[in-house]
Design a protein with these regions (language model features):
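Extreme N-terminal segment that seeds HTH/winged-HTH DNA-binding domains in transcriptional regulators
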Residues: 1-32
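Short, positionally conserved secondary-structure boundary motifs
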Residues: 5, 29-32, 40-123, 150, ...
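C-terminal regulatory/effector modules of DNA-binding transcriptional regulators
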Residues: 122-195
Length: 195
C-alpha cells in the first residue's frame, strides 16, 4: 500500500474514533488507535495530516479541522439509464455542514412527522434544516406555528392572505384562524436510508 493510501486509511480510522468517542486521541494513544508501532510514526502521520489540512496543532494538542469532517464527492450517478463508470482519479471534497448550513447562528433542525409534504420530497422521519430570521416568500417551505400548533408546509398567498399548503392532495390547505408565525424557512433536508 502506498503512503497516500495508508494515510487515508489512518484518517478514516481517526474519523471512526471521533464518531465513537467525540474526542481526539492523545499523541500517546494515537499509535494504538491507528495501529502504528512507534511515536516517530505517529508524529510523522500527524505532520502529514496537518500539512494536508485535516488536523491542526493548538496549544500542544491535536484537533480536527473542518476538512477532517469533509468527505469525497465522487461525481454524479444517473438514476435513469446507467452510464459509463468514471475512474474517479480526482475528486471534490464535500463538507455537509457547508453544503446545508449558510448561517449557523440561526439554523436548527426539525424531524418531519407525517406525510403531508411527500410531494416536496419530505418524508416521515426526515430531518429538515431550518433557517430562522430569513425573509419568506410564497413557495417557500416553512416551519410555522398556526393558531398555536406547529407544522411544516409550503407558504402560499391566496386572496391576499397567507395560507399553509400541504404537498399531498390528501390534505387540505390550512387557513390561519387567529395567528400565523413563521419560525423559519426549510433550506435543506436529509435522511438515513438505514432507519
Amino acid at each position: 500500500m502506498d503512503a497516500a493510501a495508508a494515510d487515508i486509511r489512518y484518517l478514516n480510522t481517526l474519523r471512526v474514533h471521533w464518531k465513537r468517542n467525540k474526542a481526539f486521541p492523545s499523541m500517546a494513544k494515537m499509535a494504538d488507535v491507528v495501529g502504528l508501532k512507534s511515536a516517530a510514526g505517529v508524529f510523522a502521520l500527524v505532520g502529514r495530516l496537518s500539512d494536508a489540512g485535516y488536523l491542526q496543532r493548538t496549544d500542544g494538542r491535536i484537533a480536527p479541522t473542518k476538512k477532517f469532517f469533509s468527505y469525497r464527492l465522487l461525481g454524479s450517478v444517473r438514476a435513469g439509464v446507467p452510464q459509463e463508470v468514471d475512474q474517479y482519479e480526482g475528486f471534490e471534497v464535500l463538507n455537509v455542514e457547508d453544503y446545508l448550513i449558510a448561517h449557523p447562528e440561526r439554523t436548527s433542525f426539525c424531524t418531519v412527522r407525517g406525510d403531508s409534504m411527500t410531494g416536496a420530497g419530505l418524508l416521515d422521519g426526515d430531518i429538515v434544516v431550518v433557517e430562522h430570521n430569513t425573509p419568506t416568500k410564497p413557495g417557500d417551505i416553512v416551519v410555522a406555528v398556526v393558531d398555536g400548533r406547529a407544522t411544516v408546509k409550503s407558504l402560499a398567498l391566496e386572496a391576499g392572505e397567507y395560507v399553509l399548503k400541504p404537498e399531498n392532495p390528501a390534505y387540505e390547505v390550512i387557513r390561519p384562524g387567529e395567528s400565523l408565525e413563521v419560525l423559519g424557512v426549510v433550506v435543506g433536508s436529509f435522511r438515513s436510508m438505514r432507519r
